[in-house]
Amino acid sequence: MAKPPVRKPKKKVCVFCQEKMTYVDYKDTTLLRKFISDRGKIRARRVTGNCTQHQRDVAKAVKNAREMALLPYTSSAR
């Protein structure tokens, strides 16, 4: 039996490059929550589709937002 053809997954596009955003603001929690899992962890680059530089910027912004108590370090769900 022949295997069905495997489709290549679509390459994800960096949201920040697409919108031509140069700065990731740590105060924009609605944007940053898209890059955090339900457990409160920062999502990987292969999951979010960010480019390398913007993934670093997102990580720094999330860490700053956590320090300023805008985002939780962990989720409250158990």
UniProtKB/Swiss-Prot annotation:
One of its GO terms (molecular function) is structural constituent of ribosome. GO terms for biological process: translation. Keywords: Ribonucleoprotein, Ribosomal protein, RNA-binding, rRNA-binding. It comes from the Bacteria. SUPFAM superfamilies: Ribosomal protein S18. Belongs to the bacterial ribosomal protein bS18 family. This is Small ribosomal subunit protein bS18. The gene is rpsR.
